[in-house]
């Protein structure tokens, strides 16, 4: 027991990052698959007891409990975790998201990323600018602010995909953006398409 403990204590966070970074690079270089779809998200992991890095933060299922708030990246085509950063529970969704994105893409060096999908926690100018600079296609859920609501309620050209589900598009420029971007809007009738 103590021998294992002494051995494992030699691994610092920096050593873990270096070892597992190289391991991930090797693993993805060996995959004979290209044109990945990368999904990015964050989640809340409730903790029991006093685990290192756990802190009180946003926790919808068990408010007030200690938790971690990790960032995750998945290669959805083959259902593999591409990158995982464990963060304290009191970390906001957008903390270090750009560094996480850059680090994830560096581990997939030599592979083509055909599409990046992200939740609204990643909807920020820096992320959009970075993805566009890299020439990556992306779908990011946007935050539902008043200007988006206005566009949604005043849009008249909707395409019905199926009963109770319609899409439309508009051009939107948030404060601080140098240019407008295309926004695809989705609306669904809850009675016809419940969750």
Identify the residue ranges that each predicted region occupies.
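Active-site-proximal, Lys/Arg-enriched surface segment
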Residues: 1-72
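Short, conserved catalytic/metal-binding motifs centered on acidic residues
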Residues: 1-4, 34-45, 79, 113-123, ...
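Short, structured patches in soluble enzyme cores that scaffold and shape functional sites
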Residues: 42-44, 75, 85-88, 120, ...
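Electropositive, glycine- and tryptophan-enriched low-complexity nucleic-acid-binding patches
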Residues: 60-111
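Short, surface-exposed basic-aromatic patches at helix termini and helix-loop junctions that form
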Residues: 109, 128-137
